[in-house]
Amino acid sequence: CQSTDNRRLEKTLDLAQSNRGELEKVIQYYSQNEADSLKLKAARFLIMNMPGHYSFIGRNYENYCKASEKIIFSKTSMNKKVDKLNKLIRQYPAECFERVEDCSIITADYLIQNINIAFEDWQRGNWAKGITFNEFCEYLLPYKCTETQAFDNWRTVLRPIANDTLQDFEHNDLWNKTSYWA
């Protein structure tokens, strides 16, 4: 008899079709070392929850990303950036992008890197001390911030910015000592 989680995992692996091997590499990678058992559980969680999550691909999407990055990192006022981005969005409606299931295109290297960085942040960040494993899986572990986001190195880019900001939350467990927690 197969558990519900094993059936969900197998369903995702089947849905991945030719990309199945990439997802299996992630499971194999974390299966090699007993010390990675929690990372293996996290990897299985991510993979099981991939169905229904999509990314955009294709030349139109690549052109849109390049153009939006150019605007975002330009040295113009925020109002001008917003105006330019709104104009760009009208030039590239979502219908002109090819949408594919994440499980069919995500790479093992990308997932492994994201899992490892998420674990580092969870285990080393003072701000994350009170986060349970289930909360970690739901809120810190996901491999992208928004639906249809490109598989980029967002954690590496945002980490220095976020870590500086999150240092202010070193004492974030104070809320559970209040009457609201009772």
Description of each model-found segment:
Residues 1-181:
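N-terminal accessory/pre-domain segments preceding catalytic cores
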